[in-house]
Amino acid sequence: MRPDYRKAMLESEIMKLITEALREAKDPKISGQIITISRVELSNDKRFADVYVSAMGDKDERVKTVEYLDKIKGYFRTYLANNLDLYTAPQIRFKEDPGIEASVRIQELLNKIKEEETQ
């Protein structure tokens, strides 16, 4: 099995498991929110996993959500260790995904241009 293929499969599996862990979490701070894991990037040595998260709400709420997820990352690492077939579970680093916000902004700009053209 090629290393790139294995890394991609592990990233996909980690994304699936973290999504499951979010769904099963009993924490009231995250259970009522809509949180989406957009992608996972695993380091070459498989020791670190950067998890890109998007959450509903304004900028402050999104930042607080990502900071809180980073604060309780031990829960997610334990969940990965129990469900993933690796020697050691990777350390998780949650990061806000700017891609979704950027695509929404681009769509708003395109809609604005379209409205100006019709007038």
From Swiss-Prot:
Q: Name one GO cellular component term.
A: cytosol
**HAMAP family annotated for this entry?**
RbfA
* SUPFAM superfamilies for this protein: Ribosome-binding factor A, RbfA
Q: Which InterPro entries match?
A: KH_dom-like_a/b, RbfA, RbfA_dom_sf, Ribosome-bd_factorA_CS
Q: Which GO terms describe its biological process?
A: maturation of SSU-rRNA
State how it assembles: Monomer. Binds 30S ribosomal subunits, but not 50S ribosomal subunits or 70S ribosomes.
The molecular function terms of the Gene Ontology recorded here are: ribosomal small subunit binding
**Which UniProt keywords are given for this protein, alphabetically ordered?**
Cytoplasm, Ribosome biogenesis
Q: Which family does it belong to?
A: Belongs to the RbfA family.
**Could you identify this protein by its name?**
Ribosome-binding factor A
Localization (cell)? Cytoplasm
The UniProt entry, under Pfam families, shows: RBFA (PF02033)
What's this protein's function? One of several proteins that assist in the late maturation steps of the functional core of the 30S ribosomal subunit. Associates with free 30S ribosomal subunits (but not with 30S subunits that are part of 70S ribosomes or polysomes). Required for efficient processing of 16S rRNA. May interact with the 5'-terminal helix region of 16S rRNA.
